[in-house]
Amino acid sequence: MFDVQIFDEKKFLSKKDISLIKKVSKFIFIEEKLKNKIIFELHIIDNNESQKINKQYRNKDYPTDVISFSFWEEGLLKTALLGEIYLSYEKVVSQAEEFKHSFERELGFLVSHGIYHLLGYDHEEEDEAKIMFGKQYQVLKLCGLGSVND
């Protein structure tokens, strides 16, 4: 069982967007065969807040699309709270335009990206990236949001 707690203070998300986030999350938790009750927080923010967080925690002074803070410790979950994801709504919009695909696909991609980081996946090395992005594309496909080439 999983629960996503969505914090959207600026009311960027529609009900349809929230449903999509829950659908993507559910598919990941099914695909990863997670059994325990797991909760994660998703904070929908603007580019200004994204830039502040990116500068504070990554020492990079520009907005980023998604930042995850995992509470996993060496593959062990000490609490039901898996972690926190901060997602820039403005980046979802601009990157959907930039990559010439739908807002929904970009939202699904970035939510899945954040969740997989919470689960301990990374993309620093080529072999890690292949695994992580492969999982993301599989979830997008299962959710009807296209494949790797879309």
From Swiss-Prot:
Q: What does UniProt give as GO cellular component?
A: cytoplasm
User: Does the UniProt entry include the keyword Hydrolase?
Assistant: yes
**What top-tier enzyme class does this entry carry?**
hydrolase
Please name the GO terms of the biological process aspect recorded for this protein, alphabetically. rRNA processing
Where is Zn(2+) bound in this sequence?
H113, H117, H123
Asked whether the UniProt record includes Cytoplasm among its keywords, one would answer yes
The note on cofactor binding and number reads: Binds 1 zinc ion.
Q: For this UniProt record, give its keywords in alphabetical order, as a comma-separated list.
A: Cytoplasm, Endonuclease, Hydrolase, Metal-binding, Nuclease, Ribosome biogenesis, rRNA processing, Zinc
Name the EC number(s). Answer: 3.1.-.-
Top-level division of the source organism's lineage = Bacteria
Under HAMAP family, the record lists: Endoribonucl_YbeY
Family statement: Belongs to the endoribonuclease YbeY family.
What the protein does?
A: Single strand-specific metallo-endoribonuclease involved in late-stage 70S ribosome quality control and in maturation of the 3' terminus of the 16S rRNA.
Q: What is this protein called?
A: Endoribonuclease YbeY
